[in-house]
Amino acid sequence: MKCSVLQMSRLSWTACVLLLPLLLLTLQGGVQGCFIRNCPRGGKRAVDSVQPTRQCMSCGPEGVGQCVGPSICCGLAIGCLMGTPEAEVCQKENESSAPCAVSGRHCGMDNTGNCVADGICCVEDACSFNSLCR
């Protein structure tokens, strides 16, 4: 049976149209989550429909803070510790494929951040001073 060039072109086009969605679904399924503070904007979590279901790890003296970044530990009683031995435990959050949820009162633009220490509000990729967090 001979196939004309036109038939082959239609066959190739149909195969591409059918295989492209399959390829995209496969790639999306292979994407792993990442630590809530080190994902690129619009990156891994943007395609992940699962919301964080676990609290971020405790850190700091006597575990009174919470991890809000790979080397950042914040708490109401301790402020924010960055790059200190007490914040080193926060590196373990990077090993988890599931993002964690930072606890604290909502703050920031459109209430997308959380108060993590006295006067400090952290959003997805940055922390700043915020009078709502007092």
Curated annotation (Swiss-Prot):
Pfam families: Hormone_5. Residues 1-33 form the signal peptide. Expressed by the venom duct. GO terms for cellular component: extracellular space; secretory granule. The keyword RNA-binding does not apply. GO terms for molecular function: neurohypophyseal hormone activity. Its main location: secreted. Residues 44-50 form a propeptide. Keywords: Cleavage on pair of basic residues, Disulfide bond, Secreted, Signal. The cysteine framework of the terepressin is C-C. This is Terepressin/terephysin.
